[in-house]
Each structure stands twice: as structure tokens, then as C-alpha cells.
Amino acid sequence: LITPLRICKTNEPADYRITSPDKWQYKRCIIGKKFSNSVGVSGILIEPTSQYIDLTFETMSRYGEDVGFNTLRLFHATSNHFPQLIPAITPEGLETFTPQPGETCYRWTHTQNTIQLQGANSYKEESAAIYGASLENGESGIIVHTIGNNSATYECYNRVEEYGKKIAPLAPHLVIISLGTNESV
């Protein structure tokens, strides 16, 4: 699971990047006044402030390994008015489908390290809320999803409405709760 942390004005890991030339509103699951319980599985959400959506998802190698993907699972608002986002450059063999409400899946033939999704947003911001994405390559192995926010605690995630249902699309076989620095305050 990758989340648009940089768009939310917080630290983002060095092995992926989610960027946009546009401005976004954001909400985070954190301690204090800025707490929002309307966030998705990632503990954050971004909402477009313009009539157009332009997001780029990119993986970056830290040690020279191939980190390409040929599947992007986009987690978003379950609204019937979520905008149709399409790749700026259509990858070979592209299939787009919605396996369940709140998830749009893009799958194509060959792995690549970046994909740019674009589309018109003709409804209200909350109809187009985006929570994060899973980038997958179809190879066997372990898929690890991590969820975390600066200034978030277990109690914050526990207050998010129907959080267990929001994790369900990830189909976890094991959930590990690792309490960190935020729990010590």
C-alpha cells in the first residue's frame, strides 16, 4: 500500500512517489485537532480542489532491483460519482475494472515503474477522495502493506469509522500492529 503522504505535507518513503501538479485538500488520522475519521485504509485521504485530476505513481529502486509493476489497485471513495481516471499513456493490454466499491484496478501486460492517471472531476471533492494504491507485479511472493502517519497512534486508527471493513480489500492473511514512538507520549 502506498499513500500520497507528500501531497498531505508529511514524510514519504524514498522507494515510491505519488505526485500531482494540482493542489489537493487532505485529511489525516492523527492526534489532536486535525483528526479525521473519514479517512480510508491508509489513514489519510486527498481530495481534488480542481475540475481535473492528474496523479503520477512511481516506484524507485534503492538498491538496483527491478521494482516495476503491472497492476495498480486504486483505493478511493465508494461514491457512485468517483471520476473515471485513465492512464495518460495507455499501457499495452490495459484492463480496467472495479472488483468492489471503493477500488479501481488497472492491469496491463508489461511491468513499468510509473503510470500517470488523469480524469475530469465534475462532482464534489468528497466523491473523488483517494486513499492510496497497491502496486503489484503478478509474481509470487509476499505482499507487504504498511500503514502509518506521523502523529498517528493506535487509538487514532481505532476511532476511524469501520476501519476493519476498510482493510478488507487488502485481503490480509496476517495483521501485525507495531506500536512506535507516537504511543510513548
Tell me the role of every PLM-derived stretch.
Residues 2-88, 95-185:
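Conserved SGNH/GDSL esterase-like catalytic core that processes O-acyl groups on lipids
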